[in-house]
């Protein structure tokens, strides 16, 4: 993307949105670590209202984009319109909030220089918050709502296992292997690269208080797309795992997008060096070909015994209904958790001086953008 400045065309950076955390059927899940590979300077926002943290990140991202740098926008599963962080790969820098760090990365590795950012200091004055007793009740209710959501997701996973079992029993594994071999050959041919491939683990989408959210259109923009159709248990994730492993073996950088419901499953693989994306295109991230180069891989037609849907229709109906009910209930609990968190944070959020946040964010952006420019490594004041 280009824009004009004083008659000169300037290339604007590209923003890539995704999730690295998720509310999953296996509990809270964090995939941030791979996004920090190669990062040597990280600003970490200490506890502060989520909206204030996200506002600072948006400004930093915009400054980087205007400086022709690509950015990764890490969205929050608690509210997908807010950010967990922003990464500027070309500058080997990032700005995240402390809560996005997985526990095993606290403290950060020694090769990542860290600066603590205290947004709560940029306040215009104190606001009356919840009384201590009310605050304790709200915190307990928040924890209960999140816990209820995870219980519902776990119940949905048990139901989903029954759903998968029907199709696994009707599957031709020989046919699935033929499909995998065919698409390995089609995507990679005889090609390889003389380097070690990089694997980035992310989430394709996330269960949020607003429902299931994904960024498939943004992530696959400009790529040749293979849309995998099928059923639960029809081999979609297995095919994607095979393609990811093959890409890495051949030295390609591979983006591996995990299922936001079950992080042990894979929903999308992108190999940008080949201009290719292959993804599970079934609900809740169901898409249909809308680009001239889009192609469908139908695992049901290719690998499952004909008539399986019809043969098991009576068995499938209550499974599908029970799964949908559990997922809907889980989303309701997430929405309640968001409402409670907003109430808890509201007084502190109202006390934040957003103009000071904006001014400080531009300064932080300038520091982050200097790092890695022309090989320089910056060391801002206050480096921890």
Regions found by a protein language model. Give the residues of each.
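Internal, well-ordered alpha/beta segment that forms a basic, Gly-enriched binding/recognition surface
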Residues: 110-150
